[in-house]
Design a protein with these regions (language model features):
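Glycine- and acidic-residue-biased ligand/ion/polar-headgroup-sensing regions
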Residues: 50, 59-76, 183-204
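Double-stranded beta-helix
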Residues: 100-145, 229-247
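C-terminal functional regions that serve as terminal interaction/effector modules
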Residues: 190-198, 206-247
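Contiguous mid-protein beta-loop-alpha structural module that forms a pocket-lining wall or clamp
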Residues: 73-81, 85-121
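Regulatory nucleotide-sensing modules
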Residues: 164-169, 176-185
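Active-site region of the double-stranded beta-helix
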Residues: 13-66, 71
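A short, N-terminal "cap"/entry segment at the start of jelly-roll beta-barrel domains
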Residues: 1-38, 118-169
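Short acidic-glycine-tyrosine-enriched beta hairpin
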Residues: 75-94, 202-222
């Protein structure tokens, strides 16, 4: 499966929500996900309102969150969440709260399989299952300066994390103008998300700009992306398979 996540679709799907604690947010789905098929990936931008709190919770699927705007904190860590911080939480792993700063905080949530929704702690603690718990967070992955990016003579791929034995990995790829990069999936990963953080990339003639993305299942990898008149930069988030403990 290969899906393109576009801003046009996200804007058409934009809807406001509110949690039980009063936290308000906008949700922008980048592509359509079936509510009836667990094998449907999810990718959506959350715009969390200023000075609001997304309470501690867990999900039943592995997920990445890519923070894209604003500032906040997560859990007990004093480290600020800024663009472009990557946070990974495994299935049935509690995390949070996510506390938004005075300008709010935005983040893209990505899953290879559909999740029915957050399970809040302590209210839904009885739904937690026994098994491995895992989370990981990067430093802010700053885009390359425009002059340095324009001076590149060939694509440059930097490993940010992994690959781990279960397939968890994060890469940062920079492409000069008129270049091509065959993005390969990490061994053992079930899928990867390719997110544009600077410039424009193309996939089979479809142009993808900032925050637009590609979902690529392992069976459809590798994925060729190109640039034309200007350089670009992407993050590649490799999703581990569900742990057998939660099968």
């Amino acid at each position: 499966m290969l899906l393109l996540g576009t801003r046009e679709f996200a804007q058409s799907a934009r809807k406001q929500g509110q949690l039980h604690n009063g936290m308000r947010y906008w949700r922008n789905d980048f592509f359509k996900s079936s509510d009836d098929d667990v094998c449907t990936p999810q990718c959506y931008l959350v715009e969390q309102f200023p000075d609001s709190v997304n309470p501690t919770h867990f999900h039943v699927q592995n997920q990445f969150q890519l923070f894209t705007r604003g500032e906040g904190t997560i859990g007990r860590s004093p480290k600020p969440l800024q663009a472009f911080t990557v946070h990974y939480a495994g299935a049935y792993t509690g995390y949070g709260p996510i506390v938004a700063g005075p300008e709010g905080v935005d983040y893209i949530t990505m899953r290879a399989f559909r999740d029915p929704g957050a399970k809040f702690v302590p209210q839904q603690r009885e739904l937690m299952r026994v098994g491995p718990k895992r989370h990981w967070a990067s430093e802010a992955l700053l885009p390359m300066e425009a002059g340095e990016l324009a001076a590149l003579q060939a694509p440059r791929a930097d490993g940010v994390h992994g690959p781990d034995p279960d397939g968890l990995a994060v890469d940062q790829i920079r492409l000069p103008a008129g270049a091509a990069s065959e993005v390969r999936i990490a061994p053992a990963a079930v899928a990867m998300f390719i997110v544009v953080i600077q410039g424009v990339v193309e996939r089979n003639g479809q142009r993808l700009g900032r925050l637009e993305n590609l979902f690529v299942s392992a069976s459809d990898a590798p994925c060729l992306i190109t640039t034309t008149e200007a350089p670009a930069e992407v993050l590649v988030l490799h999703m581990p398979a569900p742990d057998p403990a939660y099968a």
